[in-house]
Amino acid sequence: MRRPSPSLLSIGALIALGLLGAVDAAAQPARPERADLPPNTIALTDLRAFRPTSANWRVAGDATADRVRPLALVAEPGTGVLVNVPTDAAKGHLLTTWEHGDLDLSLDVMLPKTSNSGVYLMGRYEVQLFDSWGVKTPTFADMGGIYQRWDESRGAGQQGYEGTPPAVNASRAPGLWQHLEISFRAPRFEGKKKVANARFLRVVLNGVTVQENVEVTGPTRAALFTDERATGPLMIQGDHGPVAVRNIEYKSYTGAAKLSDLTYKAWSGEGIDTTWMTTRPPMREGSVAMLSSAPAAATNRFAMAYAGTLTVPTAGRYRFSLNIDWVGTEAAMQGPTVARADLIIDGKPVIVNRGAQQGTQADVDLTGGKHAFALTFFKNRQWGDQRDVTLFIEGPGLEKQPLHDESLLAAFGNPINPIMVQASTEPVVLRSFEWHRGQKRVYVASVADPLGVHYSYDLSRGAPFYVWRGPFLETTQMWDGRGEDQSSRPAGSVVDLADAPAVAYLSDANAAWPDSVIDEKEFRRNGYVLDKAGRPTFLSTVHGVAVEDALRPDADGITLHRTVHLRAPASASVDGLYVQLAQGKHVAKQADGSYAVDDKSYLVTLPSGAAQPVVRQQSGREELLLPVRFDRGESTVAYSIVW
């Protein structure tokens, strides 16, 4: 039975009585918008989530892969990680017990040198897993590629077709964990007739979008199934090469929400607020298909009331995300006299935003089927062209979808093309602000190299804090208009390094490493000098010791070598001086002598015969430190960052 839509009188009464208290944005400080509903997780304590397979698959506690030795992957005792080591006798694929259509998937993957595997959506459409470290021009067969299709009947040399290479090579070194996200939409059928091809909306590798809106006309090569259907199992290839997988999370989508019988009433004028909705006749009214502020026909000082029916596909908990973009951080741009928005479902309050913040979220349990829907909002500002209202819904089997008209948002907005900076034939040094771990760094030099290896260096700490390959910097927030945020951001796949000074004096071996430099008597930044190629060497003074810090890419453009040269005058105290090579939750020495940092997110390697660093625990983290040993007043510390 259809539920009646709430009348405007009932909405006004709820507002007047102050009963809209489900989520009240005025009762709490402004905060960032909360995350989407959590995904499903595949428990890797055993293989029960998968169909029976061969002995090449097992559950392990971790995996170690060799950067140098091809196909060398070792499983470590425990649970939480899938490890595949195929043999001639055992090389089966791994298929989930459940099937999917539309799917958002994320997982971590580790590959040894030269290894090859794949993730097959519905057992048919492959995203390639491959050791592509250092590849300059990736193809469909490289990490993150959508693999080609194959047809023997096309003739010799023409069998392979389609296939889409990743937009950029965002892969990491063998033996490091890599993060992969896939947003996939299944083919559509009307009866037995296919009416739409399968599509990869996005493939994101290590934080970089490498595929976007790629259509696949049929199963890719080596698929388990050659036909196409509405659903199929998720498959990880087992017969090509060793691979380890962990942290498998997914959202499977089976339905959609719908607004229907949607009507609106609109008001505009000086001093507008919610009382206008119950005390004055509307200036405009009508029917629409989706939510928008456009029918108000005003940029400032307007109010709207929507009423209609919301249909959801199944019973469960649904999350609503409501945003009114005219609420700002300044006092004149926020508060109950400037803005308010109320979401009401079945006559009950779900969200109230009294102008304290732009975005508010709330969860509500709904039965499957139809529900009375109401949304009211007003803007009472005399300047500023912001008037966008957005409302998203997400729930069981329901992809996060807009209930507003997104096409009108584009018309309201002013799209900005990203402002990019690249290094072409010579290095680039760009000074800017840059965000790091929630803090805006203001003494940053970002350095791009034509070889494709880049880093950001904090001159106030004398240390690099980001390294990456691929595109260099996106500077829109610096150079568009007034440059409101005044910050740049790395455009490639970023590795986060230590958040601390690189060179420090410790009073004893257990003293805490400083997290910043605040005493200019202990640290003085002295700028940088450029070599003949245009690459900088950063200069500083630490406890009277002159420090020269040079970071240089290797000839292949895949690693970054760092050389820290220290010169101590006779008057300087040099006992207790250390260089921090790395810092993270965990630092572990590997069989090849390198050190894996932060759960194998990057490696630190030292030259053969170099002094050995020490790993110590400090405040819940681990540090890789090298005591400085001077010879005739000079010392050099050299190591490489591998990712």
Feature locations, PLM:
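Beta-strand-rich ligand-recognition modules
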Residues: P165-P166, T217-G218, R229-A230, D346-F378, ...
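Short, well-ordered beta-strand segments enriched in hydrophobic/aromatic residues
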Residues: L105, V109, D549, L560-A568, ...
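Short beta-strand-plus-loop segments that form exposed binding edges in beta-rich domains
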Residues: D239-H240, L375-W383
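Short, well-structured beta-strand segments within conserved domains
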Residues: L105-M110, Q178-F184, L234, I248, ...
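Beta-strand-rich N-terminal accessory domains
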Residues: P29-R31, A35-D36, N40, T97, ...
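Short tyrosine-centred short linear motifs in exposed loops/low-complexity segments
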Residues: S115, T314-F320, G328, G368-K370, ...
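Bacterial N-terminal signal peptides
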Residues: S10-G21
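Carbohydrate-interacting regions of secretory-pathway proteins
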Residues: Q28-P281, E285-S293, A298-A307, T311, ...
